[in-house]
Amino acid sequence: MIFVTLEHILTHISFSIISVVIIIQLMTFFVHEIPALSDSLEKGMIATFLSITGLLIIRWIYSGHFPLSNLYESLMFLSWSFAIIHMIPKIWNHKNKNYLSAITIPSAIFTQAFATSGLSTEMHESGILVPALRSHWLMMHVSMMLLSYAALLVGSLFSIALLVITFRKNGKLVVENQNLLIGSSFFDQMDYLNFNENINVLENPSFSSSFKNYYKYQLVERLDYWSSRVISIGFSFLTIGILSGAVWANEAWGSYWNWDPKETWAFITWTIYAIYSHTRTTKNGQGANSAIVASIGFFIIWICYFGVNLLGIGLHSYGSFILS
């Protein structure tokens, strides 16, 4: 009973903290960036990560198995994965971490909100594992797949943002909000201009067009950079996850590959991002061309993760779920 109580407490703590974090992020997005708030944002994400980590450990202890046996647990692990990805630039001391936080923080809160409020209460309970899941491969295979989903989703969202900006007909690029352009935590600092001169420069018609085109180019370059880096990490995790799943399938079902719906869509997902990786190596593959492939992959992942579960058929049918 005490474990269940602790789990509920940590669930509410993590969701409350990340809710405050996203409010802080919106404040720094629409208003001029405040260093103290940015520091609080980072501390909040660390606290969220620790809370979800504690929640998963407690659930592991009282259930007796790694907490990845149903959709609720996988969603909480996915939210934890978004927090991990968010902290990678901080670990590497990367100066442009604000780009990543603009994707990871909303992803983490929406995932956790759906896990806690969108699923039936029965899905929150940790039941007895079906025989096929009673294996040491559970931790390896499922954790790698979920880490890959998190990284690939984040990278694909960068690509979608890149396409929106690239093909936007009006080149205003949210210039109406001067604070957003000058000091936004999402679009980064414009270090090559003196802050006191920014407003006058933007109001100069002769400079405005070239300035916005240059800024648009810089923004697209940043989005392309982050998209390729995060997707490369996710693709590595996906490859490891599929290979470990094949070994596990051979132990459980006597065959490395059975082409059931989950395996088929996992293979389609891997193929899409393999095409993305290949496209990046071609002469004109960077930028919008590879971003189109990654954007397709974004929807393929959701089909693989959620869509197949809705069918409730195949060797992975124990992953089906009921909405509340």
From Swiss-Prot:
Species: Lemna minor (Common duckweed)
Protein's name according to its UniProt entry: Cytochrome c biogenesis protein CcsA
Subunit-structure text: May interact with Ccs1.
GO molecular function, a single term: heme binding
HAMAP family: CytC_CcsA (MF_01391)
GO cellular component, one term: plasma membrane
Family annotation (InterPro entries): Cyt_c_assembly (IPR002541), Cyt_c_biogenesis_CcsA (IPR017562), Cyt_c_biogenesis_CcsA/CcmC (IPR045062)
Family the UniProt entry places it in: Belongs to the CcmF/CycK/Ccl1/NrfE/CcsA family.
Pfam families: Cytochrom_C_asm
Function: Required during biogenesis of c-type cytochromes (cytochrome c6 and cytochrome f) at the step of heme attachment.
Membrane-crossing segments per the record: 17-37, 44-64, 68-88, 99-119, 145-165, 230-250, 264-278, 291-311
Record localization: Plastid, Chloroplast thylakoid membrane
Assigned keywords, A-Z: Chloroplast, Cytochrome c-type biogenesis, Membrane, Plastid, Thylakoid, Transmembrane, Transmembrane helix
Membrane-topology annotation of the record: Multi-pass membrane protein
Source organism, top-level taxon: Eukaryota
One BP annotation, GO: cytochrome complex assembly
